[in-house]
A protein has these predicted regions:
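Non-transmembrane, aqueous-exposed alpha-helical and coiled segments at domain scale
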Residues: 1-190, 195-280
């Protein structure tokens, strides 16, 4: 049994919120640089270069890489041999978010009630997901999610007979409908299987997977590669102004499902695709 004070969770999440909003992750940085060299449209290439300049300035001057600093999404993988002390874990997570956004001078974008729309003024609460795993460590993934791309995301409740071709069409439909509104080049997270809520969660977590990696499942790997190729042939391009780079990656997660269903979720993220991972 390992004892861990929840203050460590708060400290880490504060740092992660600030880091995610000022610095592009290494995998995304590589993907963006590669896109500049492979983009076929002169205008698209220019837009990608401008985005690269923006990212450099943000890191150098500690300015957020996007004015929408997002709603904080936190994934916690908690070892079953960890015992927390010093307070409530969920309160500690939200305290870390609060410190990160207040002390980091990040935009506060969360409202207390979806209808009454009163701002909480500290970007809490976050969206928190828990998973119990073997061991005595805690893995934290923080992914601030802007709503330009979030609003473009979709869930499709397909029929089993729709099969993999139906899945492909659902993903392509979501991307086409998103168009320039998702601030492309985008990263596309896809969840297949489970239930209505499970496929959406898988699609969200897929966005935290390293860009450029591929699924270990052969048919899923092929699906990721085919979808990326087909999406980039749509021609939406950087900034939605045309080009060969509409998406930087398609990451697909799958899960067992009911005999009567084929749930598919598409969670789209913009070109910054913020995510930071710490293990305590």
């Amino acid at each position: 049994m390992r004892t861990l004070n929840v203050e460590e969770i708060s400290k880490n999440i504060k740092e992660m919120c600030i880091e995610a909003n000022h610095f592009l992750s290494k995998d995304m940085d590589i993907a963006m640089k590669n896109a500049v060299s492979t983009e076929k449209s002169p205008l698209g290439k220019k837009i990608l270069s401008q985005l690269q300049d923006n990212l450099k300035i943000a890191g150098k001057d500690m300015i957020p890489i996007c004015q929408d600093t997002g709603m904080a999404v936190v994934f916690l993988e908690i070892g079953q041999d960890v015992h927390f002390e010093g307070g409530n874990l969920e309160d500690a997570v939200n305290e870390g978010i609060r410190r990160g956004y207040v002390d980091g001078y990040l935009r506060k974008s969360v409202v207390k009630d979806p209808i009454l729309r009163e701002n909480t003024k500290d970007n809490t609460p976050g969206i928190i997901h828990y998973k119990i795993v073997p061991g005595d460590q805690v893995k934290i993934k923080v992914a601030p999610k802007g709503f330009g791309s979030e609003n473009m995301s979709r869930v499709f409740m397909l029929k089993p007979a729709d099969g993999i071709e139906g899945v492909k069409e659902a993903v392509l439909t979501a991307v086409k409908d998103a168009g320039p509104n998702a601030c492309p080049p985008m990263v596309v997270g896809v969840g297949i299987g489970g239930t209505f809520e499970k496929c959406a969660l898988m699609a969200k977590e897929a966005l935290t997977r390293e860009v450029g990696s591929r699924s270990d499942i052969p048919y899923v790997k092929e699906l990721e590669e085919e979808l990326l190729e087909r999406i980039n042939k749509i021609g939406i391009g950087p900034g939605g102004l045309g080009g060969s780079t509409t998406a930087l990656a398609v990451n697909v997660n799958t899960y067992p499902t009911h005999i009567a269903g084929l749930p598919v979720a598409v969670n789209i993220c913009c070109h910054v695709n913020r995510h930071v991972i710490h293990t305590i």
